[in-house]
Amino acid sequence: MPVNRYRPFAEEVEHIRVTDRTWPDRVIDRAPLWCAVDLRDGNQALIDPMSPARKRRMFDLLVRMGYKEIEVGFPSASQTDFDFVREIITEGAIPDDVTIQVLTQCRPELIERTFEACAGASKVIVHFYNSTSILQRRVVFRADRAAVEAIATDGARRCVEEAAKYPDTQWRFEYSPESYTGTELEYAKQVCDAVAEVIQPTPENPIIFNLPATVEMATPNVYADSIEWMSRNLANRESVILSLHPHNDRGTAVAAAELGFAAGADRIEGCLFGNGERTGNVCLATLGLNLFSRGVDPQIDFSNIDEIRRTVEYCNQLPVPERHPYGGDLVYTAFSGSHQDAINKGLDAMEFDADAADSDMDDMLWQVPYLPIDPKDVGRTYEAVIRVNSQSGKGGVAYIMKADHGLALPRRLQIEFSRAIQEIAEGSAGEGGEVSPKEMWDAFAEEYLAPVRPLERIKQRVIAAEEDGGTTSIDATVKIDGKEAEISGSGNGPLAAFVHALGTVGFDVAVLDYSEHAMSAGDDAQAAAYVEASVAGKTVWGVGIAPSITTASLRAVVSAINRASR
């Protein structure tokens, strides 16, 4: 590959030196100001830009989620955008606590058209920009620093003039030195300070300086250093809201945003699920839920992540990848056996700790391996947390049997049954395919519940001991190889009595382990019983399910005998 055609960032732009940087030691303990730009930066990157109906659906979603600043379009560049801005203003769709933002270049006629679109709105941020990078100054504008700075300051003056024509609107201003990451820091500061001289911001009405990684050009620490330098050196900093707008060209937009925020920024612009030009804008869902996962309130409601994703997919006509953080179909799913086992044990420990604390599990500190957040907190269920394929082990099988079918399999039975499931998975077209919960249940029923040869229990009558330690007797009707027989026995309980009775007709059975549980809560709950037995010297497991625990335990013995005869 022709690596000689490329050069280090320090050679292409400059070597950013912040030797006394403080951002590496800072811990993010609050949410930034958010601005969602799905309707503008996101929309302009779509193969088929949003229709008015899709735009409105996206806007309403962002409002419901709690975004207070929403960039709604580029009204001077598109009649569709102009009409949409007019629609949400005239129809009263903008809540009192939401400020719309509109984008414009610095040309006078475009600024004028932008203000026309916003007439009648209560609160508006006018976002004007021009590119300041070394490369664009040379190849696009063919202009020197002074000329490019003049574009920005002339645009600022025109914005102030137009705002005066609409005194009933609360105007705020945002300026972006576009392609900031390709601009010398000292020059970026110079242009921003010159714009501020025109706008005359105050702490009560600050200007927003948005420093976009229009193209991501270096590692996130370089971006963070540049943000800390700008935050320290901008004039009149108390009257400035420092905003970030990272793109994802190098795949590190989230890291750049988080480090830039730690470095002194106040605000972040992005799109839900990272839509945007080329590789996209920074993902607002990832940023917000990263905060949430560390106990910081993002001030945005992600409690129904699937509804959010469906709406975004509909509006953008683009799918959200299955592995996208927090929102993808597979992000809370484990196929690996060791992962499944750890998750299963973690959930069991959570349940145990909640019971010990007499608390609801939803109120407990979340601590489950491999799951950074509780899927339920974003509206997911546990049904898809563990899925079984040829890479899975007993933990995954045990989890699904308990979560989906109410069976808490003993550990050795987990191991035995997981082998059968692995054989099924490896036999799926020879490709290690997935085994669904239904397929798993069908296999379990076929292996442990269905066989009726050589032994089938028909009915029984149990006479319990009147005193503890007394003898229980049983009379049972069974079929042996299809022929009905009456058997009787006694023992220290129904199970022992039944085993004794079976011995009288030639079945050599010794119970090695036994457990039981209700499969659900309530008076009508089914009971499950598990028997590990030695049948004619062969150790096998049997399972019984019935409305009564006595019948379930006898069925488990019958299951073990029939499995031993295979």
From Swiss-Prot:
It catalyses: 3-methyl-2-oxobutanoate + acetyl-CoA + H2O = (2S)-2-isopropylmalate + CoA + H(+). PROSITE patterns: AIPM_HOMOCIT_SYNTH_1, AIPM_HOMOCIT_SYNTH_2, PYR_CT. One of its GO terms (molecular function) is acetyl-CoA C-acetyltransferase activity. Residues 451-566 are annotated as: Regulatory domain. One of its GO terms (biological process) is L-leucine biosynthetic process. It is found in: Cytoplasm. Its main location: cytoplasm. Residues 32-306 form the Pyruvate carboxyltransferase domain. SUPFAM superfamilies: 2-isopropylmalate synthase LeuA, allosteric (dimerisation) domain (SSF110921), Aldolase (SSF51569), post-HMGL domain-like (SSF89000). Homodimer. Catalyzes the condensation of the acetyl group of acetyl-CoA with 3-methyl-2-oxobutanoate (2-ketoisovalerate) to form 3-carboxy-3-hydroxy-4-methylpentanoate (2-isopropylmalate). Belongs to the alpha-IPM synthase/homocitrate synthase family. LeuA type 2 subfamily. This is 2-isopropylmalate synthase. It comes from Mycobacterium ulcerans (strain Agy99). The gene is leuA.
